[in-house]
């Protein structure tokens, strides 16, 4: 009897131990599955920057390289100019983006400078002999010229020399950002060190008012600048077309249109009536 009791007790202990092992194994498997599920959930790829941005006639191909990081990037690139594989390495996409910013700034200055003499002349703020349409100031010699202190050819050579020097310095900074702050330049080199981004050098010379003090405001200002720059480039193109078609300046065109919209508009100027 004692022997049977010992055997029974041993069997019960063995069964209990087996049960604990089975239950423990299942619990361990369950925990492992849950843990592996959590790991898989955490490995979800992040959302691309600018994924929810506004798009203008974007294609699947353009969105493969225009990811919204550049200011004013709406995925619009019908000619594939910014495609790093479409140019065969001949044109660097970063250079195109940089060039758009620079040309936009020149266009904004040009658009304002071309129309300002007309407006100031009409308002009587400057003499009439200097209130000329932009194409009569010497930029297009056959259309007329103003009597400056030197002839047009001398002025052209001088402008080319000055602009060539400025553009050379700008290209040096593009090739090696910050290099202009290391070269002597009339004591101004401290303000030419830049920010590391050639398109937005900042500093006391290029951002004296300290705009864009935080990342959010800087991003908004970059977007506004590129939009206005693109508009200004279109305006300059419009100035050229107006000059060829109407023979008067943009401000005079506006006054003529407001005075008689029916007979002075795009269609009548192009003889589509």
Curated annotation (Swiss-Prot):
InterPro entries: Chloro_AB-bd_pln (IPR001344), Chloroa_b-bind (IPR022796). Chlorophyll a 3 binds at residue 225. The chain crosses the membrane at residues 106-126, 231-251. Residues 1-32 form a transit peptide. GO terms for cellular component: chloroplast thylakoid membrane; photosystem I; photosystem II. The modification N2-acetylarginine is found at residue 33. It comes from the Eukaryota. Chlorophyll b 4 binds at residue 170. Keywords: Acetylation, Chlorophyll, Chloroplast, Chromophore, Magnesium, Membrane, Metal-binding, Phosphoprotein, Photosynthesis, Photosystem I, Photosystem II, Plastid, Thylakoid, Transit peptide, Transmembrane, Transmembrane helix. Chlorophyll b 1 binds at residue 56. Chlorophyll a 4 binds at residue 228. Chlorophyll b 2 binds at residues 105, 140. Coiled coil: none annotated. GO terms for biological process: photosynthesis, light harvesting in photosystem I; response to light stimulus. GO terms for molecular function: chlorophyll binding; metal ion binding. Chlorophyll a 6 binds at residue 257. The N-terminus of the protein extends into the stroma where it is involved with adhesion of granal membranes and post-translational modifications; both are believed to mediate the distribution of excitation energy between photosystems I and II. This is Chlorophyll a-b binding protein 8, chloroplastic.
């Amino acid at each position: 009897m004692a022997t049977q009791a010992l055997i029974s007790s041993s069997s019960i202990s063995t069964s209990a131990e087996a049960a604990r092992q089975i239950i423990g194994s299942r619990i361990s498997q369950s925990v492992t599955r849950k843990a592996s599920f959590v790991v898989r959930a955490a490995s979800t790829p992040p959302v691309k920057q600018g994924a929810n941005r506004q798009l203008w006639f974007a294609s699947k191909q353009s969105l493969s390289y225009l990811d919204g990081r550049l200011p004013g990037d709406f995925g619009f690139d019908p000619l594939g100019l910014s495609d790093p594989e479409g140019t065969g390495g001949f044109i660097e996409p970063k250079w195109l983006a940089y060039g758009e910013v620079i040309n936009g700034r020149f266009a904004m200055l040009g658009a304002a400078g071309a129309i300002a003499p007309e407006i100031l002349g009409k308002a009587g703020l400057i003499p009439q002999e200097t209130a000329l349409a932009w194409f009569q100031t010497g930029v297009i010699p056959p259309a007329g010229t103003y009597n400056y202190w030197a002839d047009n050819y001398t002025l052209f050579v001088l402008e080319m020399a000055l602009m060539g020097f400025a553009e050379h310095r700008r290209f040096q900074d593009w090739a090696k950002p910050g290099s202009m702050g290391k070269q002597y330049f009339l004591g101004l080199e401290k303000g030419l060190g830049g920010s590391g981004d050639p398109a937005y050098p900042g500093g006391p010379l290029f951002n004296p008012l300290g705009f864009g003090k935080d990342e959010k405001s800087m991003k908004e200002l970059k977007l506004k600048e590129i939009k206005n720059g693109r508009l200004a480039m279109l305006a300059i193109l419009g100035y050229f077309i107006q000059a060829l078609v109407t023979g008067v300046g943009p401000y005079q065109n506006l006054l003529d249109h407001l005075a008689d919209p029916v007979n002075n508009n795009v269609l009548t100027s192009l003889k589509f009536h």
